[in-house]
Amino acid sequence: MKVIFLKDVKGKGKKGETKNVADGYANNFLIKNGYAVEASNAALSTLSAQKKKEDKLAAEELAEAKALKEKMEKLTVELKAKSGEGGRLFGSITSKQIAQTLEKTHGIKIDKRKMDLPEAIRALGHTKVPVKLHHEVTATLDVHVSEE
């Protein structure tokens, strides 16, 4: 029997996949438990429409991320902090502070976890911070830390 998987089934198929399986397995396990539906013409057309919709949505997200990247790479986030001798900061600048300042000054809301800052900024000056906007798009944000 030909079925369309609604969920991932280990060893048999992934969500959205169409596959031939034994009749008993399809009726007694997959369809009964909601893991699959029988592959009729109506179900296949619904599946193709759903895939087109998902592809369109993914393309829109990618375009949005690319536009945001262009905008972000032109910006400089200005932060002020107290510092001692040699430009060393008292404390540090974290990705959370960068995200808050970015939202406050430029109106761009970015999750702090998307900023790839392995260690907090502990010195005055310019720092390039990579920001993962999409799994294919990474922007580089310029952060300038000046003395308070």
Curated annotation (Swiss-Prot):
<dbReference type="InterPro" id="IPR020069">
    <property type="entry name" value="Ribosomal_bL9_C"/>
</dbReference>
<dbReference type="InterPro" id="IPR036791">
    <property type="entry name" value="Ribosomal_bL9_C_sf"/>
</dbReference>
<dbReference type="Pfam" id="PF03948">
    <property type="entry name" value="Ribosomal_L9_C"/>
</dbReference>
<dbReference type="GO" id="GO:0019843">
    <property type="term" value="F:rRNA binding"/>
</dbReference>
<keyword id="KW-0687">Ribonucleoprotein</keyword>
<dbReference type="InterPro" id="IPR020070">
    <property type="entry name" value="Ribosomal_bL9_N"/>
</dbReference>
<dbReference type="GO" id="GO:0006412">
    <property type="term" value="P:translation"/>
</dbReference>
<dbReference type="GO" id="GO:0005840">
    <property type="term" value="C:ribosome"/>
</dbReference>
<dbReference type="Pfam" id="PF01281">
    <property type="entry name" value="Ribosomal_L9_N"/>
</dbReference>
<comment type="function">
    <text>Binds to the 23S rRNA.</text>
</comment>
<dbReference type="GO" id="GO:1990904">
    <property type="term" value="C:ribonucleoprotein complex"/>
</dbReference>
<dbReference type="InterPro" id="IPR036935">
    <property type="entry name" value="Ribosomal_bL9_N_sf"/>
</dbReference>
<keyword id="KW-0689">Ribosomal protein</keyword>
<keyword id="KW-0694">RNA-binding</keyword>
<dbReference type="GO" id="GO:0003735">
    <property type="term" value="F:structural constituent of ribosome"/>
</dbReference>
<comment type="similarity">
    <text>Belongs to the bacterial ribosomal protein bL9 family.</text>
</comment>
<dbReference type="InterPro" id="IPR020594">
    <property type="entry name" value="Ribosomal_bL9_bac/chp"/>
</dbReference>
<keyword id="KW-0699">rRNA-binding</keyword>
<protein>
    <recommendedName>
        <fullName>Large ribosomal subunit protein bL9</fullName>
    </recommendedName>
</protein>
<dbReference type="InterPro" id="IPR000244">
    <property type="entry name" value="Ribosomal_bL9"/>
</dbReference>
<dbReference type="InterPro" id="IPR009027">
    <property type="entry name" value="Ribosomal_bL9/RNase_H1_N"/>
</dbReference>
